[in-house]
């Protein structure tokens, strides 16, 4: 879910930079997923699979239910990031001979990478403890929140307390790892800026 949220949100951010036909409708559809009750979305996905005579599982209906919750946040974050991205940087890269793919790979992605990590954190956090949207469409394989609710209804066990204790530590490790990645990316970017300044600051350079 986290990887798909990052990928689709990034592509949506690129698409919304262009004034394509229907972009306003797409934007309001994204916002509608935030407004609609979680149970109704889960029920709609479940009924859709039932009408198509398909079996809903965690990698089909469950995945769609989770993405309907994580993608709106990811898309809105990427829209804010791309709105602040200076297009003259990409134009300068093209003036230096870069094509569209090289400009995307060496300019756009490095600049927006911290934002994509933030989108990934949002996607992980929202999906990790999602219950209402998953309860009706996960099939026979339950996610952790659904399984914990089911076990709690039949009586608490030591394993349930152990899982409840380890869950915050696992989430904390993911958050710390993300901050470390952002720190090293910013440090690397600062080093590249210093190297460029030294290059162009030398006498006779250029």
Question: What residue ranges belong to the model's regions?
Answer:
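Hydrophobic alpha-helical transmembrane segments of multipass integral membrane proteins
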Residues: 1-8, 12, 105, 109, ...
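Interhelical loop and adjacent transmembrane-helix boundary motif
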Residues: 128-180, 206
């Amino acid at each position: 879910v986290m990887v798909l949220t990052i990928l689709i949100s990034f592509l949506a951010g690129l698409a919304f930079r262009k004034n394509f036909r229907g972009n306003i409708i797409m934007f309001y559809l994204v916002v509608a997923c935030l407004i609609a009750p979680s149970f109704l979305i889960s029920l709609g996905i479940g009924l859709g699979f039932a009408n198509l005579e398909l079996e809903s599982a965690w990698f089909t209906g469950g995945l769609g239910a989770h993405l309907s919750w994580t993608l709106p946040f990811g898309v809105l974050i990427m829209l804010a990031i791309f709105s602040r991205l200076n297009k003259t940087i990409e134009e300068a890269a093209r003036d230096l001979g870069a094509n569209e793919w090289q400009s995307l790979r060496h300019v756009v992605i490095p600049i927006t990478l911290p934002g994509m990590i933030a989108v990934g954190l949002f996607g992980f956090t929202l999906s990790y403890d999602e219950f209402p949207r998953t309860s009706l469409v996960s099939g026979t394989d339950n996610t952790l929140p659904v399984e914990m609710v089911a076990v709690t209804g039949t009586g608490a066990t030591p394993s349930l307390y152990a899982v409840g204790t380890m869950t915050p530590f696992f989430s904390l490790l993911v958050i710390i790892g993300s901050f470390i990645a952002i720190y090293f990316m910013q440090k690397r970017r600062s080093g590249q800026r210093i190297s460029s300044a030294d290059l162009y600051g030398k006498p006779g350079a250029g």
